[in-house]
């Protein structure tokens, strides 16, 4: 009697993880799979059954079609491999090197520094219209003696935005 009470009983069944190791719990009704994995498995079985019923046939013509189809697939695979080989010519390599070289020259190599005081500015630098980079102290045109003519640029912008309209001269009667 003591033998029946001690360790002969199986432990109570708790939740089991999905058999596909997706991290969710499965149930016995869904073959120890979670609901998503079970739906996916049923969908794959349906698709396999549809494909098998569409491909299989009782006539011998379906077998001929299968053989022709597989032969065509083999031909397509072998043909698709041949055009994929590409020969590299030295002239094309030089063109690529020429294209890459200007991009590398455009990027500044060292840290960005203020033109006036040579202080490191990094991302907080201010680029002036004269083309130089300045720190927060020297960013104003009057502080760094900017060579850009703001007055002339403003006059040109106004002239473009507001063209002068002249009426034709009227003839006197």
From Swiss-Prot:
Q: Which UniProt keywords apply?
A: Metal-binding, Zinc, Zinc-finger
Task: Provide the binding site for Zn(2+) 3.
Answer: 128, 130, 144, 146
Q: Which GO terms describe its molecular function?
A: DNA binding; zinc ion binding
- Zinc finger region(s), A20-type: 12-46
Binding positions (Zn(2+) 2): 114, 117, 135, 138
ZnF start-end (AN1-type): 108-154
Record: residues binding Zn(2+) 1? 18, 22, 34, 37
| Entry-linked InterPro entries | AN1-like_Znf, AN1_A20_ZnFinger, Znf_A20, Znf_AN1
The record's disulfide annotation reads none
**Under which name does UniProt file this protein?**
Zinc finger A20 and AN1 domain-containing stress-associated protein 2
Instruction: Quote any Pfam family the record assigns.
Output: zf-A20
| Its biological purpose | May be involved in environmental stress response.
- Keyword Transport applies: no
């Amino acid at each position: 009697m003591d033998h029946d009470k001690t360790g002969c009983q199986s432990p109570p069944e708790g939740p089991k993880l999905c058999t596909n190791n997706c991290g969710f719990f499965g149930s016995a009704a869904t073959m120890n799979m979670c609901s998503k994995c079970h739906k996916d498995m049923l969908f794959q079985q349906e698709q396999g059954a549809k494909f098998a019923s569409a491909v299989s046939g009782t006539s011998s013509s379906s077998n001929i079609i299968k053989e022709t189809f597989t032969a065509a697939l083999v031909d397509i695979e072998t043909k698709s491999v041949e055009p994929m080989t590409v020969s590299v010519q030295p002239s094309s390599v030089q063109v690529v090197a020429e294209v890459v070289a200007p991009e590398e020259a455009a990027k500044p190599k060292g840290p960005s520094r203020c033109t006036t005081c040579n202080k490191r500015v990094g991302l907080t630098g201010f680029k002036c219209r004269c083309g130089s980079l300045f720190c927060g102290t020297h960013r104003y045109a009057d502080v760094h003696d900017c060579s850009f003519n703001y007055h002339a640029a403003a006059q040109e912008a106004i002239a473009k935005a507001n063209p002068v309209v002249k009426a034709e001269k009227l003839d006197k009667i």
